[in-house]
Amino acid sequence: MKFDPTSPSLNIMLANPRGFCAGVDRAISIVERALELFSPPIYVRHEVVHNRYVVQNLKDRGAVFVEELDQVPDNNIVIFSAHGVSQAVRAEAKARGLRVFDATCPLVTKVHLQVTRASRKGIECILIGHAGHPEVEGTMGQYDNPNGGVYLIESPADVETLEVRDPNNLCFVTQTTLSVDDTLDIISALLKRFPSIEGPRKDDICYATQNRQDAVRNLSADVDLLIVVGSKNSSNSNRLRELALKTGTQSYLVDTADDIDSSWFENITKVAVTAGASAPEVLVQQVVQAIAKLAPSVVTEVEGRKEDTVFAVPAELR
């Protein structure tokens, strides 16, 4: 289907902030620097960030992505992904003599430390997150006290059926790719059932997740369609799409410009484009160019919250 070239201009509104966050920037930089300083192959446990384009680019430069450490030969370099790993994985790497560079996002590490402290004190810990996500697996793997317990919940319904040892000795943490709004109802249910439960400090919330969701929320009411640039296995990218759908705005998740379907734009005059925290800006610009070919278009950068957070790479890689 082709658009009538005489049709009204399509207003393409670019959300801000969008795309790479400081944790993703740092993780990619760690792999790039390791490839520059040491001879390939450089092994990376799990996709360093959840973006197909980024992973393929690093593969082409000599990175080898594996799911488990038994795929890494002894005495080699291994990089842990931005999502973090369990204590058991760290112990295995040490026992195998692997040289580790840790690309775990510092905000994920803060959550890990909370769980570790809870384990040490025997406080039972509840994690709000999505089963099967590597960050969740790594976070739950920080708890090793057999006299306590760590539990995963995904919804208010899970709170009602949750069985704990001591309802007066509880804390909770959240997956970093969930925003305040994502967890609001679950936390309310936790506080109602366990009034003495302790939660994380507000400054432990991932700024990037919240900022990108706020930008989508602010734009959704003013557009007919939202395009999210991100891979299907990217939790935060999926949340952006879901947020738009909840507000009544049609939304699609695209990995690249090749995924754009012209039928989505029938009778559309305003479209917003954003990107998950692991999607590079080059993909955003390619998507914008693909949309602009469908009809006479005007591209507008929408003002949003400024981000200046930077996380340093390990000293050995500087």
From Swiss-Prot:
Dimethylallyl diphosphate binds at residues 50, 83, 133, 234-236, 278. Pathway: Isoprenoid biosynthesis; dimethylallyl diphosphate biosynthesis; dimethylallyl diphosphate from (2E)-4-hydroxy-3-methylbutenyl diphosphate: step 1/1; Isoprenoid biosynthesis; isopentenyl diphosphate biosynthesis via DXP pathway; isopentenyl diphosphate from 1-deoxy-D-xylulose 5-phosphate: step 6/6. Gene3D superfamilies: 3.40.50.11270, 4-hydroxy-3-methylbut-2-enyl diphosphate reductase, catalytic domain. One of its GO terms (cellular component) is cytosol. [4Fe-4S] cluster binds at residues 21, 105, 206. One of its GO terms (molecular function) is metal ion binding. Keywords: 4Fe-4S, Iron, Iron-sulfur, Isoprene biosynthesis, Metal-binding, Oxidoreductase. GO terms for biological process: dimethylallyl diphosphate biosynthetic process; isopentenyl diphosphate biosynthetic process, methylerythritol 4-phosphate pathway; terpenoid biosynthetic process. Isopentenyl diphosphate binds at residues 50, 83, 133, 234-236, 278. Pfam families: LYTB (PF02401). Its EC number is 1.17.7.4. The keyword Metal-binding applies. Binds 1 [4Fe-4S] cluster per subunit. (2E)-4-hydroxy-3-methylbut-2-enyl diphosphate binds at residues 50, 83, 133, 176, 234-236, 278. CDD domains: lytB_ispH. It catalyses: isopentenyl diphosphate + 2 oxidized [2Fe-2S]-[ferredoxin] + H2O = (2E)-4-hydroxy-3-methylbut-2-enyl diphosphate + 2 reduced [2Fe-2S]-[ferredoxin] + 2 H(+); dimethylallyl diphosphate + 2 oxidized [2Fe-2S]-[ferredoxin] + H2O = (2E)-4-hydroxy-3-methylbut-2-enyl diphosphate + 2 reduced [2Fe-2S]-[ferredoxin] + 2 H(+). Its cofactor is [4Fe-4S] cluster. The active site is at residue 135. Belongs to the IspH family. Catalyzes the conversion of 1-hydroxy-2-methyl-2-(E)-butenyl 4-diphosphate (HMBPP) into a mixture of isopentenyl diphosphate (IPP) and dimethylallyl diphosphate (DMAPP). Acts in the terminal step of the DOXP/MEP pathway for isoprenoid precursor biosynthesis. This is 4-hydroxy-3-methylbut-2-enyl diphosphate reductase. It comes from Shewanella oneidensis (strain ATCC 700550 / JCM 31522 / CIP 106686 / LMG 19005 / NCIMB 14063 / MR-1). The gene is ispH.
